[in-house]
């Protein structure tokens, strides 16, 4: 290359000619002989020669300044490059190379006036894999779209001894605007609602125009974020840590990702699989912030298996990374853990869109479970990475919504309650809650009550945590069917006991968890906002706090909703303060605090030591929440000496255990008479006699009772009838015995 020739010119021309169809350059181009002595430089690109004519000319001066000129001929354009005073090197190039939108697009992205010094400086700006990272890896596993869970209706199967309710679908009229889908094809493919100009203005890449969608997760400010860009053939993970040029991870089928001279794709391939490549574009000056790129095991958990198996990908990759991020308290940080999690999330979206390539039929329950799993990891990404309030654009899945609509209004499409939970979850997360009927939420609330009863005297199973995770999200993402949502909310609150919190901290000590739901506790979605390390230390002053307790409280802080705005009578509660909110019935709520916090009818607790206070405020579910720090209407707490189960007057109530000096210890929800009997049965040791411990019952009618010394009167009509039936059966058996003996 002659001195003074911009480096882009030759390479760019080679690129253009290799991408343009072979054609004549001028009327007599086909008859011209190729004389090598007639050209200053001859390049041959795949049989298509580029000819640079040798010609020296002089240029007249004008106003004592030199100018180079471009001579336009019929079939060529000449470029004049200064060599010495009054002497230029002139290169003639075919005009067709510079005509049309493709040429214009590329010419607008290169600087033909770039100096050699700037060119050399740019060569040393970006990190090369072979030179600066030295961590290239290839994976040879076979890639095939499939689902390792087969037709399994739930990711975590239920215990064999748990009876799963069947869905009862009432007679109903199909909505007039219903257009349900009858296919699962393209079910997990999000709607590409944008046309993107990718890599526009990037130093290394030519821009490309393609259908795409963007998702941004902004942390503390505009300069700290992770962005996901998904296209048909590849995805891009953009990571910015206060940088003017963010790091790019580009993965997929990449023939449309084109590099500017002098760089080549091979310089930036960090990982390679059977079908896809991973490119990393990062400046050398930023390697100290992204030092994990040099780790030989970076992204192994995402790529070292058949990642086109969506279920395996979610379990082995995303959930593995997400569990690590959550347990280590790395949400709202940008390091190796969160970058790997973001990559696994993008890979899950990429793989999910290709599930129809498996070519196998998929059942409706399995399809709903997979789609709910995709929306659930999106929800976690927003919870973990986005600032408050979140600004992330939600991905839309129109085919999944159509399928859910069909299943909801067509008999026998879904049979188990677990599928209904996922169907409702999908509609709620796709802003379609107006399509959710009341009967669906009613059955989900009944399922929550079943889990409540199943685990009154036992720890939550992995299956129960999975289902409560989904239901807890429903509670805080919908505005309709408030009665049913209030019931689910109080169930989650009642399950958030000290025993659950203790068991949860023990779970965190285990090194392996397959799914995020394994780390879910009802405390995350409940009305209990009074758990803190300081409070636990006060409750157990002589106990050594396990190392997992801070991690457990960090998880609670991360996973708890940032607002209670879906409940009109609770939305104003300041979530930074300590309180417990109890939606015991359709119309009555209680807020338990150590100071006046919300307007309503308050019941100050008098049996606490000096310096400690406990205030129970009753509110009406239809009354708008109003924050107040002043004393207002108060009622006294009545001591109850006995409780009658007649007419279930004590159903839908909360049993509150508190200590004279430490305040609230436990809260238990009692939905029906069986729960009341269980709580007050001395053999269950729920109510334990102690000089410092007291028990209050918060009733559905707005009354608060002291029940520390209560005696249960179980002689209600229902129990009497059961006794009569039992006595009659005994007498009948005895008479039958006498008759047989006589014979």
Curated annotation (Swiss-Prot):
What Pfam families would the database entry show?
Answer: Herpes_glycoH_C, Herpes_glycop_H
UniProt-listed InterPro entries? Herpes_gH, Herpes_glycoH_C, Herpes_glycoH_C_sf
Whether ATP-binding counts among this entry's keywords is no
Q: Decide whether keyword GTP-binding is in the record.
A: no
Q: Which residues are glycosylated?
A: 56, 63, 68, 193, 642, 701
List the subcellular locations: Virion membrane; Host cell membrane; Host endosome membrane
User: Could you tell me which residue ranges are on the Intravirion side of the membrane?
Assistant: 742-743
Report membrane topology: Single-pass type I membrane protein
The Gene Ontology biological process annotation of the record reads: entry receptor-mediated virion attachment to host cell; fusion of virus membrane with host plasma membrane; symbiont entry into host cell
Side Virion surface, residues: 24-720
List keywords of the entry alphabetically.
Fusion of virus membrane with host cell membrane, Fusion of virus membrane with host membrane, Glycoprotein, Host cell membrane, Host endosome, Host membrane, Host-virus interaction, Membrane, Sialic acid, Signal, Transmembrane, Transmembrane helix, Viral attachment to host cell, Viral attachment to host entry receptor, Viral envelope protein, Viral penetration into host cytoplasm, Virion, Virus entry into host cell
Q: Transmembrane stretches, by residue range?
A: 721-741
Q: What is its main location?
A: virion
- Gene Ontology terms: cellular component: host cell endosome membrane; host cell plasma membrane; membrane; viral envelope; virion membrane
Q: Which domain of life is it from?
A: Viruses
How would you describe the post-translational modification of this protein? Answer: N-glycosylated, O-glycosylated, and sialylated.
Signal peptide location: 1-23
Q: What does this protein do?
A: The heterodimer glycoprotein H-glycoprotein L is required for the fusion of viral and plasma membranes leading to virus entry into the host cell. Following initial binding to host receptor, membrane fusion is mediated by the fusion machinery composed of gB and the heterodimer gH/gL. May also be involved in the fusion between the virion envelope and the outer nuclear membrane during virion morphogenesis. In human cytomegalovirus, forms two distincts complexes to mediate viral entry, a trimer and a pentamer at the surface of the virion envelope.
Q: Give the family per the record.
A: Belongs to the herpesviridae glycoprotein H family.
UniProt-recorded name of the protein: Envelope glycoprotein H
Gene from which this protein is expressed:
gH
């Amino acid at each position: 290359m002659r001195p003074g020739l911009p480096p882009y010119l030759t390479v760019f021309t080679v690129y253009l000619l290799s991408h343009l169809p072979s054609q004549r350059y001028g009327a007599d181009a086909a008859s011209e002989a190729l004389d090598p002595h007639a050209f200053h430089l001859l390049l041959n690109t795949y049989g298509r020669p580029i000819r640079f004519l040798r010609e020296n000319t002089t240029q007249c001066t004008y106003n004592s300044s030199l100018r180079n000129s471009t001579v336009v001929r019929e079939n060529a354009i000449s470029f004049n490059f200064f060599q010495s005073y009054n002497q230029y090197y002139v290169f003639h190039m075919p005009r067709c190379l510079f005509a049309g939108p493709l040429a214009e697009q590329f010419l607008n992205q290169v600087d033909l006036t770039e100096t050699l010094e700037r060119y050399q400086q740019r060569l040393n700006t970006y990190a090369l894999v072979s030179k600066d990272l030295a961590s290239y890896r290839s994976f040879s596993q076979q890639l095939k779209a499939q689902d390792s869970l087969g037709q399994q209706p739930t990711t975590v199967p239920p215990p064999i001894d748990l009876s799963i309710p069947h869905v009862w679908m009432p007679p109903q009229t199909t909505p007039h605007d219903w257009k349900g889908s009858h296919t699962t094809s393209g079910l997990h493919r999000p709607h590409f609602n944008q046309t993107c100009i990718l890599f526009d203005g990037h130093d290394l890449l030519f821009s490309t125009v393609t259908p795409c969608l963007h998702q941004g997760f902004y942390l503390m400010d505009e300069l700290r974020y992770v962005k996901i860009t998904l296209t048909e053939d590849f995805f891009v993970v953009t990571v910015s840590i206060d940088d003017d040029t963010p790091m790019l991870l580009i993965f997929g089928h990449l023939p449309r990702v084109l590099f500017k001279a002098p760089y080549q794709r091979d310089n930036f391939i960090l990982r390679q699989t059977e079908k896809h490549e991973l490119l990393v574009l990062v400046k050398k000056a930023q390697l100290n912030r992204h030092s994990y790129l040099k780790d030989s095991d970076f992204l192994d958990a995402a790529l070292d298996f058949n990642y086109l198996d969506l279920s395996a990908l979610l379990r082995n990759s995303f959930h593995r990374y997400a569990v690590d991020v959550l347990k280590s308290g790395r949400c709202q940080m940008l390091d190796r853990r969160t970058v790997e999690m973001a990559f696994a999330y993008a890979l899950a979206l990429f793989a999910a869109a290709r599930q129809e390539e498996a070519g196998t039929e998929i059942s409706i329950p399995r399809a709903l479970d997979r789609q709910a799993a995709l929306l659930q990891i999106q929800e976690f990404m927003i919870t973990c990475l986005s600032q408050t309030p979140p600004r992330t654009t939600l991905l839309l899945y129109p085919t999944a919504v159509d399928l859910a609509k069909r299943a909801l209004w067509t008999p026998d499409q879904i049979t188990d309650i677990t599928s209904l939970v996922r169907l409702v979850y999908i509609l709620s997360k796709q802003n379609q809650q107006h399509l959710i009927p009341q009967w669906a939420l009613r059955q989900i609330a009944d399922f929550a009550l079943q889990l409540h009863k199943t685990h009154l005297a036992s720890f939550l199973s992995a299956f129960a945590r999975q289902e409560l995770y989904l239901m807890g999200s429903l509670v805080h993402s919908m505005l309709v069917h408030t009665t049913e949502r209030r019931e689910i909310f109080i169930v989650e609150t009642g399950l958030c006991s000290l025993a659950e919190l203790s068991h949860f901290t023990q779970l965190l000590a285990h090194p392996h968890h397959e799914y995020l739901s394994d780390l879910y506790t009802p405390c995350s979605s409940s009305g209990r906002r009074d758990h803190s390390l300081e409070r636990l230390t006060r409750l157990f002053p002589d106990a050594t706090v396990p190392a997992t307790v801070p991690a457990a409280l960090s998880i609670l802080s991360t996973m708890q909703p940032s607002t209670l705005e879906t409940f009109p009578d609770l939305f104003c509660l300041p979530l930074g303060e300590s309180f417990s909110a109890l939606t015991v019935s359709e119309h009555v709520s209680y807020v338990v605090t150590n100071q006046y916090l919300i307007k309503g009818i308050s019941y100050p607790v008098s049996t606490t030591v000096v310096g400690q206070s406990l205030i129970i405020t009753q509110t009406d579910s239809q009354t708008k929440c109003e924050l107040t720090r002043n004393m207002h209407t108060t009622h006294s707490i009545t001591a109850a000496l006995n409780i009658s189960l007649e007419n279930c007057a004590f159903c839908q109530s909360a049993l509150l255990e508190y200590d004279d000096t430490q305040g609230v210890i436990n809260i238990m929800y009692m939905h029906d008479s069986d729960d009341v009997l269980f709580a007050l049965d001395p053999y269950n040791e729920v109510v334990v006699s102690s000089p410092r411990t007291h028990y209050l019952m918060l009733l559905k009618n707005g009354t608060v009772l002291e029940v520390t010394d209560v005696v249960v009167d179980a002689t209600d009509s229902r129990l009497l009838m059961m006794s009569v039936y039992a006595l009659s059966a005994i007498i009948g058996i005895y008479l039958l015995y006498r008759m047989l003996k006589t014979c």
